[in-house]
Amino acid sequence: MVSRSYSNLLELASGDSPTFGRMNRQIPRIMAVAGIMSNIDNDSKDTDLSPKDRIIIVANELPIRAQRRVDGNGSGSSSSSTCCSKGWNFSWDENSLLLQLKDGLGDEAIEVIYVGCLKEEIPLNEQEEVYQILLESFKCVPTFLPLDLYTRYYHGFCKQQLWPLFHYMLPLSPDLGGRFDRTLWQAYVSVNKIFADRIMEVINPEDDFVWIHDYHLMVLPTFLRKRFNRVKLGFFLHSPFPSSEIYKTLPIREELLRALLNSDLIGFHTFDYARHFLSCCSRMLGLTYESKRGYIGLEYYGRTVSIKILPVGIHMGQLQSVLSLPETERKVGELIERYGRKGRTMLLGVDDMDIFKGITLKLLAMEQLLMQHPEWQGKVVLVQIANPARGKGKDVKEMQAETYSTVKRINETFGRPGYDPIVLIDAPLKFYERVAYYVVAECCLVTAVRDGMNLIPYEYIVSRQGNEKLDKILKLEANNRNKKSMLVVSEFIGCSPSLSGAIRVNPWNVDAVADAMDSALEVAEPEKQLRHEKHYKYVSTHDVGYWARSFLQDLERSCGEHGRRRCWGIGFGLSFRVVALDQSFRKLSMEHIVSAYKRTKTRAILLDYDDTLMPQGSIDKRPSSKSIDILNTLCRDKGNLVFIVSAKSRETLSDWFSPCEKLGIAAEHGYFLRLRKAVEWENCVAAVDCSWKQIAEPVMELYTETTDGSTIEDKETALVWSYEDADPDFGSCQAKELLDHLESVLANEPVTVKRGQNYVEVKPQGVSKGLIARRMLSMMQERGTLPEFVLCIGDDRSDEDMFEVICSSTEGPSIAPRAEIFACTVGQKPSKAKYYLDDTTEIVRLMHGLASVTDQITPV
């Protein structure tokens, strides 16, 4: 399919779209024709994750270390883990999560290709050579960015605007995060576009899976989906996602949301982050989501975007191998000599020098501990490892200065010769050195005020498990080597929900953190062992391999419907999205239905009212004069039987449609029926006892009082609780609770409780819009005028009964042979209807077209 946008889906309603021959399975160095894909859009094969398939992992940085050669005379030699060019040495970055992810999948399981930037700037004249070396030796595709562009993209938009906002920092003043700068946003978009071009060079869209990582590349899914409508695309956000109240301050909020929704699967570390994302989609885009069989799905233009909630894990094998290194053992011995021999207990903090890590708050809590519990003075040491800051800016420098001054003040107050209560290590440490500190520390403190996953607690737990050699160094008795560990973790980090045995704290409450530190020191040994055992069991079974395999399995499942749907790209720029429809579900063409209308003589037309003829959210619900004129014109043709089918009361509908003499009306979902204005209303079902209202109404009143914006409508035979004007999230939550409550208290009553779009309704059993459709067809059959043309339009779950009756009647005697059947829903969504129109504007336009034809064939 040619990669282009369509602003009018009618152009493609017939399914005629250009196709091209299947691409060769071999991956080309550069795509021969940019933007042209294979005929996978017409390929119905299922998605199977086989050993021959590949994953293209895309991130801001490649898992590669690049070092300039001093002699510059490399011969291009290489090994399994290193490679040399004339000017550079390249090797794997063993600490990179992306490389650990590959190891977790297994060497033989699937081929992995990496796309990303190098940490070092490569001169222009060396880029082609470096590209070839990394592609051939490491299966890495480097993305070379000009320094100025990279600075504006990474240090500008990513670190000054997205990063603070995603960590709940609003730019209320120039000192509190960067104000929105559109030039930085343009740089961000440009870099994402460059990444898309790089992926195009190696992707085989028919088979490859693409997995994008983190907030640096949030608009990349749009560029890939625009090129290949059926690309198998996953995205994982490693940072927090803010609440809707924070996120909606972002000027490009909708662009980012729509870009992410071009993925098939979106992953988050915690339910809180996913919940915030779903809330933003609901409030800003009006999307709905549901949980089905354990999976959360967002309906977006006919596609289901799946939501994955699973925290990342650590690489167990790598950490265990580091624990076994002689260097680690020597370092552990040194630390025991320095602290253990002096009878001092080590508390450990390991954080980046970052404004969100809460280092200063941790130091203040240590100060509070020593003040409130002087018995710990001289006995407890807080070792704070401060990794170099990743970001730049005034706030980072101020935080560093505050950290140093706080450490100095506390050590001067509580220190003594040979004892400093706080040891600050701000020089870079090798990984084995950090692991040695984990092994010796009795408690690990993570007090970030906002963070993504944070794997420090996981590393600490596995390090405390140790091995036999370390047990000997620690002088653990052979018959009593039960391991123990203690964790004090912030409530605001991604790993907190997974660590049920940790002491959780609000890092802003310094007193509470100090109390938690004291509790961790006082916990009995057996309890420390139980907590450690519980944590180690979880961490060891939910490692990075488990995380990667689980994500890819869900990505495969999410892409399973690709081959069975027709896809069209619509929109321009970052508003681009793909409409995915079932093969039998298509947009209702004006030309098609008008042609059928002209060919036929007897017609049945059933129209829902709310959100079908009347736009959703309208304050004045009365039909417009234009709608009245259209209905009167259609009713003027003696071959037409036209019905409005609504949940409204008969009094309301009688008033609204009083100008329509020949219009049929079905009120309260079909309980009441009137063939035309001159005849009396009749009941479609036997008279019912409405004494159940005495039970249901007090329940609804309770929820109305507690849900601002909700109302109750008391009809003759039904009660409706509406939350159209309430907060969408709270209203939906209350509706679910109300539904359960009503079903419980009305279990023995002859009623059904239904939930529709922004309402919960209680009505008599057996009453449905399908009943009206069946009655209408029966009346025409009794008159001997079988309908040759049937049009049924609705937007709600209640209208599905009409669609089912209309579509199934083709096999019965109530419809003429070869009748033209048009069951049409509003919007692209799962439905029993075969057609759709986008909104009420298109519906009114369609009805106006039919009325114009009626004027031609039935003059006044």
UniProtKB/Swiss-Prot annotation:
<comment type="similarity">
    <text>In the C-terminal section; belongs to the trehalose phosphatase family.</text>
</comment>
<keyword id="KW-0808">Transferase</keyword>
<dbReference type="InterPro" id="IPR006379">
    <property type="entry name" value="HAD-SF_hydro_IIB"/>
</dbReference>
<dbReference type="InterPro" id="IPR023214">
    <property type="entry name" value="HAD_sf"/>
</dbReference>
<dbReference type="InterPro" id="IPR003337">
    <property type="entry name" value="Trehalose_PPase"/>
</dbReference>
<dbReference type="GO" id="GO:0004805">
    <property type="term" value="F:trehalose-phosphatase activity"/>
</dbReference>
<dbReference type="GO" id="GO:0003825">
    <property type="term" value="F:alpha,alpha-trehalose-phosphate synthase (UDP-forming) activity"/>
</dbReference>
<keyword id="KW-0597">Phosphoprotein</keyword>
<dbReference type="Pfam" id="PF02358">
    <property type="entry name" value="Trehalose_PPase"/>
</dbReference>
<comment type="subunit">
    <text>Binds to the phosphopeptide-binding site of GRF/14-3-3.</text>
</comment>
<dbReference type="GO" id="GO:0005992">
    <property type="term" value="P:trehalose biosynthetic process"/>
</dbReference>
<dbReference type="Pfam" id="PF00982">
    <property type="entry name" value="Glyco_transf_20"/>
</dbReference>
<dbReference type="InterPro" id="IPR036412">
    <property type="entry name" value="HAD-like_sf"/>
</dbReference>
<protein>
    <recommendedName>
        <fullName>Alpha,alpha-trehalose-phosphate synthase [UDP-forming] 6</fullName>
        <ecNumber>2.4.1.15</ecNumber>
    </recommendedName>
</protein>
<dbReference type="InterPro" id="IPR001830">
    <property type="entry name" value="Glyco_trans_20"/>
</dbReference>
<comment type="similarity">
    <text>In the N-terminal section; belongs to the glycosyltransferase 20 family.</text>
</comment>
<feature type="modified residue" description="Phosphoserine">
    <location>
        <position position="5"/>
    </location>
</feature>
<keyword id="KW-0328">Glycosyltransferase</keyword>
<feature type="region of interest" description="Glycosyltransferase">
    <location>
        <begin position="53"/>
        <end position="557"/>
    </location>
</feature>
<comment type="function">
    <text>Regulates plant architecture, shape of epidermal pavement cells and branching of trichomes.</text>
</comment>
